[in-house]
From Swiss-Prot:
Family the UniProt entry places it in: Belongs to the phenylalanyl-tRNA synthetase beta subunit family. Type 1 subfamily.
Organism: Staphylococcus haemolyticus (strain JCSC1435)
Enzyme class name: ligase
PANTHER family recorded: PHENYLALANINE--TRNA LIGASE BETA SUBUNIT, PHENYLALANYL-TRNA SYNTHETASE BETA CHAIN AND LEUCINE-RICH REPEAT-CONTAINING PROTEIN 47
Protein's recorded name: Phenylalanine--tRNA ligase beta subunit
GO CC, alphabetical: phenylalanine-tRNA ligase complex
This protein's UniProt keywords: Aminoacyl-tRNA synthetase, ATP-binding, Cytoplasm, Ligase, Magnesium, Metal-binding, Nucleotide-binding, Protein biosynthesis, RNA-binding, tRNA-binding
GO molecular function, one term: catalytic activity, acting on a protein
Amino acid sequence: MLISNEWLKDYVDAGVKVEDLAERITRTGIEVDDMIDYSKDIKNLVVGYIQSKEKHPDADKLNICQVDIGEEEPVQIVCGAPNVDAGQHVIVAKVGGRLPGGIKIKRAKLRGERSEGMICSLQEIGISSNVVPKAYENGIFVFQTEVEPGTDALTALYLNDQVMEFDLTPNRADALSMVGTAYEVAALYQTEMTKPETQSNETSESATNELSVTIDNPEKVPYYSARVVKNVSIEPSPIWVQARLIKAGIRPINNVVDISNYVLLEYGQPLHMFDQDHIGSKEIVVRQAKDEETMTTLDNNERKLVDTDIVISNGQEPIALAGVMGGDFSEVTEQTTNVVIEGAIFDPVSIRHTSRRLNLRSEASSRFEKGIATEFVDEAVDRACYLLQELASGEVLQDRVSSGDLGSFVTPIDITAEKVNKTIGFNLSNDEIQSIFRQLGFETTLKGETLTVNVPSRRKDITIKEDLIEEVARIYGYDEIPSSLPVFGEVTSGELTDRQHKTRTLKETLEGAGLNQAITYSLVSKDHAKDFALQERPTISLLMPMSEAHATLRQSLLPHLIEATAYNVARKNKDVRLYEIGRVFFGNGEGELPDEVEYLSGILTGEYVVNAWQGKKEEIDFFIAKGVVDRVAEKLNLEFSYKAGKIEGLHPGRTAIVSLEGQDIGFIGELHPQVAADNDLKRTYVFELNYDAMMQVAVGYINYEQIPKFPGVTRDIALEVNHDVPSSELKQIIHNNGEDILQSTLVFDVYEGEHLEKGKKSVAIRLNYLDTEDTLTDERVSKIHDKILEALQAQGATIR
C-alpha cells in the first residue's frame, strides 16, 4: 500500500517529518518498506506557458517554442513532442536543472536552433509509464487549468511529496486505506483525525424509483446497496485527484472512474460504477453464476463462469463479476450521463477463488479477499456521491436502494487495566488505556474495573482481549516497556531430554544406513490426504488454500516422499534413500482440534551401496528396508514384531504390519507396481512408523555388555512347514522354549520347489546358544534343543 504524506494530511497532521513518521509506524508493527520522494534528484522544474510554436526549418518532427517561465523574457525551447502546441501550460526544466537519472539541462543547439531548457513528459520527471494518463503517454504533460508561469512544477503537480510504501501482513487489512492509516497515526501522536466529507445536496427524486436490488444468496452476499447520480459530466479529473492516484500506483482514466478508485484507496471499500442507461433494466439481481455462463469483462476478454462465481445481473444476464471486474457493456464511457454506484459485502472465499481461477487480480479483489469494514460500505458510497457532485456536476438522488444486512459495526471485548499491566509490564490507569482506544477510534465504556471496548469492523485482526493488550503496547510504545533483569531461582545445567537423545540416535542410525533426511510440506491435495493412512479418520482441510495441491493436512508422510523420490529419479539420481520425521493430522469432528501425531517414514529405491570402491552393490529389496527398521528398533532398545498385512497403495504380497507391545504402529512394504509406474519409479520400498508410540514405550538405557568369556554353541535346523507360516512365528516358538541360554536366531535360507510337497516350504534357522556364566555342555544344549524341536513339531513343523 502506497501512502502519500500530502494526502494523509487531509485527515491527520502528526506535525513531524515524514521520515520520523515512517520510523514510528514501523516500530508499532506496520513495516514501511520504502520511501518514495518525487522531489529527489529534481532541480529547477517550473511551469511554463507556450506563447508560440513554429516548425523547425531543418527537422520535420521538431518545433521551436517560445516559453514564458516567469522570467523577464521568454526562453526558446526546441521540442519534439507530438502534442506540443501554443497556449499550453507545461512542465519545463530550466537550464542548470536536473532530472531523475542524473540528467543535467544545458543550453544546446538542435539542428542549428538554440534550446534553453526542456519541456518534459511525466515519465521524464520520474513517473512510471504504467500510471501516466493515456492522453500524455506519448507526449508532454499539459495542465488543464491555468497555472502562473514560474510556479514550482512539483508543487503544481502535487508531487512535492513523499510516499510511504507499507509492507502489510494479511491481518492488517485496515491499513489498506488512507482512513485506516489516519486512525493509526492519530493514535500514535494523540491528535484528532478528520474523516472525509460525505454529505451531498440531494435532489427531490428518489433512487427507489430508478432501480431495485435483490440478493439470491445472503450467505455469499450479506449486503448490497446502490445509489444513483444523474447528469454527470465525463472529463479529466482535477490534477490533485490524478496526482493522488498516480502516487498510489493507479492510472487516471476520467473523473467518474477515478472517483471510484479514489474512494477505494480512501476507505478500503471497493466500489463499482455502472452506466445506468446500459444496465438493461431497472432491476439488479445478485446471484450465483450458472455453469458455462459467459460474460465479457472490462478487459474485453470473454469469461466462462462456474456456479461458485458471484455475478451482478440485470435480471437476465451478468453485468459484472462481483468483487473482481465489471462487464463491458455497462462500463462508464465518455457518453455516460447517469451512474449507479455499487457498494457491497461479498464472501471473501468466493471472491478469492474466482479471482485465482480467472487470473484476475485487482485492488478490489485483494480487499474483498481480506474482508472489508462493514462500517464503511454505505459511507464510501456516500463519499463517491459527494465527489461526483463536486467533480462531475452530478445530481445525487435521495435514498439508497439496498438488500441484506450489514450486521454489527462493532465487536465488544471486556478487559481490565490490571490484565493489561500484568501482561506487558506497564502501570497504566483506566483513563490512559481508554485514551489509547479512543485515539484508535474504538468506543469504550468503563463499569467498575471492567473496560468494554467496542472494536470496529475495520479491525478484523482484533478478536480477543490479548489483541487489545497488543494494541495498547503498540500505541503506548514497545520502547516504554520497563527493563528488568530476570530473577533466577535454582540454576540447573541444560541437557537433552530423553526424546531428544533418542531422536539424535535415530537420525545417526538412519544416516549411517545411507538415508538422507527430508523435510516436506504438511499440506497435500485432497485426493492424496488419506494415502497410506493406517487408520480411518476425518481429514482437515484449509478454508482458503493457496492451491489445490496444498489444500489438506496430511495423514501420512509418504505422498511427498514419493514425489521427492520421483523428482530425483527423473533427474538421473536413481539411487534414492530418504527419511522424514514429521507430524500428521487426524480430525476429531466439527469444532474439535485435530490430533497431531509424529511419524517416522522412509523410502528406498535403486541400488544399495555397500562398498562403492569395491564395486559391491545390491538392488534394494524388502529385507534391506526391514533391516533399516530392525536397526532402528535395536538402537532404541525396542522389539518389533511383524505380520503380513495389506495397505492401500502397497504390494499386497510384500507388505508387513509392524507391531510394538501388541499395538500396530506402522508398516513396511513395496510400493504397488501401479503406484510406482505412475511415478516413473522402479521397485521402491517404504516404511512408516508411529514415532510418538515408539517414544511412549519405557525402556532402560542400553549399557555396555562384556564380550563373553565362554564359548557358544551353534546348531542349525531345517523345518518343513506350510508355505503360509511366517518365519517370525517359528522364531517366536524357538525363543519361547530356549530358556536362558538361547541368545539369538537367524533365518538363513527359505526354499520352495523341487523335492518338496506342494504348498510346503523349507526354512533353515541357525540357533546360537551361550551361557555368560559357565561353559555349555553338550548335554545341556541338547536338552534345550530337543525341547525346541518338540515344540516346533507340536505346531505342525517337520524336522528335515
